[in-house]
Amino acid sequence: MYSLVTTSIIQGIKSIPVYVEADVSDGMPLFEMVGSLSPEVKESKERVRTALKNTGYILPPKRITINFIPANIRKTGSGFDLPVVAAVLCAIGIVPEEALKNTMVVGEISLSGDVKPVNGILPMVAEVKERGVTRCIVPAENQTEAQLVKEIEIFAVQSIAEMIHILNGGTYIEKEIGKAVEKTIRLLDFSDIQGQHFVKRACEVAVSGMHNLLMIGPPGAGKTMTAMRIPTILPPLDEKEQMELSKIYSVSGQFQLREQLMEERPFRCPHHTITMQGLVGGGLIPKPGEISLAHKGVLFLDELPEFKQNTIEILRQPMEEKEVRLVRVNGTYEYPADFILVAAMNPCKCGYYPDMQKCRCTAASIERYINRISQPLLDRIDICVETPQIKFEELNGTKKEECSDTIRARVIEVHAIQKKRYQKEDFQFNSQIPAARIAEYCALSKDQEKYMKKIYKQLNLTARSYHKILKVARTLADMDGTENILDAHLNEAVCYRNIDKRFWRDSL
């Protein structure tokens, strides 16, 4: 007898439909699985055989053939266990064929017959709904995640026996599984930071145009404290962004027990010992890395020169393309990576250069330390700002600082200006303006062109860093509500670029 079961596999954050065929026929007793399978999928036949036995069902002494369609896609992971069980049970007549129509089945099984959770349930359920599937059988621990997709019936099962009961028309009782993750209460605020007004201004500019930011300064100046508060001035995620971000966390296995889509923008702060694989993603079964987990949020790299050079250099392409593309023998995995890079570093090993009274480093050691950050990576950072040691009067002052909500309101207005301007384009923010459109959206007067020509030569700018200055100036103009870029906007944008040139030039 023949049966067909619908399931899915994750590739990147996309779900690809897979169909599990089962055929039970007379012949030499054999359990065979074909269809471009990884070792863990091939091993599932032993789990299936034993789990069914421990559930009370002995497979007949017949030839059982399982085929996975399409054959050109490598099948990986343990989520195929439950669909194989369903296909076999249907083929031997334990469950009716009609019960599996328009139904997706996914889940791992233990030898006892219990159903275990799998990663990527959210994109799987969302994708099969678009294909007309009306119900899904998923592991009980994935219930809350699956139910985030509306207008599709979800059956969360804890065992093979429960799945058989449901497929044979039995009553389904919804479960209360664990405790849902509570919404995070925001405790950080820009009003916590005393002084550092130039730094806070740079943060607002960076967020307003979605520009990358580098803070350079001595230890204890507030670089990390400032970076941690940047997500509090970012606008809320829209519904599409919430779903996309939630899919990334679902695939990475960090989304279970949530009762709603992710609403807060992520803030990821990997340690400087992180590997390339941990940063950009990968692995035997590829998973998103830190740059994808920071999608639509902030990726904070503290002590930037302490990262391995080949690790941070790998950021260059994702920073431009806003996605990560991992090419493997069994396919290409694409993960979104549209983040704001916020980096912090000391200007030397001891941290106090150019204060020669405190700095203990030699000229050679300063040069070695500062040059761990390559020029191509610096060119991709729009704003560089010096974070000086805060004065005692500012630290101990009673002046009330501006709160995050006030700054965020201004940022939302600037974002609205950009989205309206670029509504017919395939980009939304000033930082994303392609080189071919710079002249159109960042137009300068004749005098401004002469000024920028002088700056271009003085600072020895590259074409990319020159364009970064113009994009930041465009953001400053939007913040002031002016249609044209003014001289003051260009001057401020040049200041943000001049700081990195000063540190790197002085180290030579």
Where are the language model's segments positioned?
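Peripheral, non-AAA+ core regions of ATP-driven protein-machinery
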Residues: M1-L214, P218-A221, M262, S465-Y466, ...
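Short beta-strand elements
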Residues: V18-V24, L279, D382-E386
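Basic, amphipathic alpha-helical bundle interface domains used for macromolecular binding and assembly
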Residues: V34-K45, P60, N67-G77, I285-P286, ...
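Catalytic P-loop NTPase motifs of RecA-like helicase/translocase cores
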Residues: S112, L301-K308, G351
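P-loop NTPase nucleotide-binding/switch module
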Residues: G169-V205, G209, P236-I291
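Walker A/P-loop
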Residues: M215-Q256, E321
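Walker B catalytic acidic pair
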Residues: K296, D302-E303, I314
